[in-house]
A protein has these predicted regions:
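Conserved phosphotransfer cores of two-component systems
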Residues: 39-42, 63-70, 89
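Two-component/phosphorelay signaling modules centered on CheY-like receiver
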Residues: 9-27
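Receiver (REC) domain active-site loop signature in two-component systems and cognate sites
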Residues: 52
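Active-site residues of response regulator receiver
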Residues: 49
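C-terminal output helix
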Residues: 99-111, 116
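Acidic, metal-coordinating helix/loop segments flanking the phosphotransfer/catalytic sites
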Residues: 28-45
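Hydrophobic/aromatic residues positioned on beta-strands within the core alpha/beta folds
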Residues: 74-76
Length: 119
């Protein structure tokens, strides 16, 4: 299952539709807190916005890595200044909004293939 975390309901809907049309099971969460309450055990991949109230995407990624270090995490942002920060550097799954849907799907497929191959 692919979890999508974003405080923008339009992005949640469009991203969910995109993933489901590509054959993935997607669950949408409007905040990091709602994802954490639901639990991480069912997840195969996490896509999270960076700029959210409360726990932001960087903090969520760090929390997830403590309990599920093997879980692929993709960060997305519409704020280009965030994309240029040091915290975003070296993140393999990093996308700026608006992102290319096919590039995102290819990156998801690649990340899931790597995780099923054990690395």
């Amino acid at each position: 299952m692919v979890a999508i975390v974003d405080d923008d309901p339009r992005l949640l809907e469009s991203m969910g539709d995109l993933l489901e049309s590509a054959g993935y099971v997607a669950r949408s969460f409007s905040s990091a807190g709602s994802l954490l309450v639901n639990g991480l055990s069912d997840l195969d991949l996490l896509i999270t916005d960076i700029g959210m109230p409360g726990i932001d995407g960087f903090e969520l990624r760090d929390l997830v890595r403590k309990s599920r270090p093997e879980l692929p995490v993709f960060l997305i942002t519409g704020r280009h200044e965030i994309a240029d920060q040091g915290r975003a550097q070296g993140v393999g799954g990093f996308f700026r909004k608006p992102f290319d849907a096919q590039a995102l799907l290819a990156a998801i497929a690649n990340a899931l293939h790597k995780s099923t191959d054990g690395g």
